[in-house]
């Protein structure tokens, strides 16, 4: 899916919501544990209840890796289900990969070719040659970690390197790489005050923004400083939606939470 196609979906649905599928066997309703594939059963129920209110889904790969082969099978089934039933929805592999070139090339093949994700999160710390293998897939997006939502972001990401903070250096350097139009960036909602400066560097690229909801980030602040004329935002919400309830009607309640966020987003889109 191209950035233009993603924007079209956002305007059509009046939503730039991304639902994070951080599926944890310790948190899903206990009755699902008797299912043959409880992770997929949970994901399917969440997707069916929320798809009309969002434009993207973001499985956090660690939650699937943690349960071994069964987790990978559930992840693949989830993506295949999305492709079959809701092909207009954008998919993000929240994998935070990044390694020397030949290793990154294998990561790219795994997530783009085998699993068929539209995009993947990548840690850019090892530099250009660790990111290029992902950018070689010109029909996919590479989402670089720029300024993350966790408290530890201040340990390194805001340190000055020369006359600029490290996160700014990452953004400024990467925008000159090949196929940089296929780059997106992770900027946490808890760092909304930095968005105006970031938009001076990358006025058009999409930003994936975690931290609205459970981490306390403000949707209004993110939109105020980060939204572009083409929207340019994907706001992720995971726990606030998927774990809104552990009762038998968990999916219905998740759908209501997603709808509430979609309504807020529609109000923000009216300001464009």
From Swiss-Prot:
It comes from the Bacteria. It is an enzyme of class 4 (lyase). The keyword Electron transport does not apply. Keywords: Decarboxylase, Lyase, Pyrimidine biosynthesis. One of its GO terms (biological process) is 'de novo' pyrimidine nucleobase biosynthetic process. The keyword Lyase applies. GO terms for molecular function: orotidine-5'-phosphate decarboxylase activity. It catalyses: orotidine 5'-phosphate + H(+) = UMP + CO2. Pfam families: OMPdecase. Pathway: Pyrimidine metabolism; UMP biosynthesis via de novo pathway; UMP from orotate: step 2/2. The active site is at 96 (proton donor). InterPro entries: Aldolase_TIM, OMPdecase_type-2, OMPdeCOase_dom, RibuloseP-bd_barrel. Its EC number is 4.1.1.23. Belongs to the OMP decarboxylase family. Type 2 subfamily. PANTHER family: OROTIDINE 5'-PHOSPHATE DECARBOXYLASE. This is Orotidine 5'-phosphate decarboxylase. The gene is pyrF.
């Amino acid at each position: 899916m191209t950035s233009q196609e993603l924007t079209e979906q956002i305007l059509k649905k009046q939503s730039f919501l991304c639902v994070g599928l951080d599926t944890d066997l310790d948190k899903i309703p206990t009755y699902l544990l008797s299912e043959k594939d409880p992770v997929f059963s949970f994901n399917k129920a969440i997707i069916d209840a929320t798809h009309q209110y969002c434009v993207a889904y973001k499985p956090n790969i660690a939650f699937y890796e943690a349960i071994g082969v069964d987790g990978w099978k559930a992840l693949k089934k989830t993506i295949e289900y999305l492709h079959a039933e809701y092909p207009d929805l954008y998919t993000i592999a929240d994998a935070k990969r990044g390694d020397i070139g030949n290793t990154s090339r294998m990561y790219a093949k795994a997530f783009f070719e085998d699993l068929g994700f539209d995009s993947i999160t990548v840690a850019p710390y090892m530099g250009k040659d660790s990111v290029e293998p992902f950018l070689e897939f010109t029909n996919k997006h590479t989402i670089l970690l720029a300024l993350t939502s966790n408290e530890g972001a201040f340990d390194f990401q805001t340190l000055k390197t020369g006359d600029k903070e490290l996160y700014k250096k990452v953004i400024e350097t990467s925008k000159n790489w090949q196929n940089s139009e296929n780059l997106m960036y992770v900027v946490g909602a808890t760092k909304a005050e930095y968005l105006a400066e970031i938009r001076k560097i990358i006025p058009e690229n999409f930003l994936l923004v975690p931290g609205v909801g459970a981490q306390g980030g403000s949707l209004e602040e993110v939109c105020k400083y980060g939204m572009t004329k083409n929207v340019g935002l994907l706001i992720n919400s995971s726990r606030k939606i998927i774990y809104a309830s552990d009762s038998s009607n968990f999916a219905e309640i998740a759908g209501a939470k997603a709808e509430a966020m979609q309504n807020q987003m529609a109000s923000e889109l009216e300001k464009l």
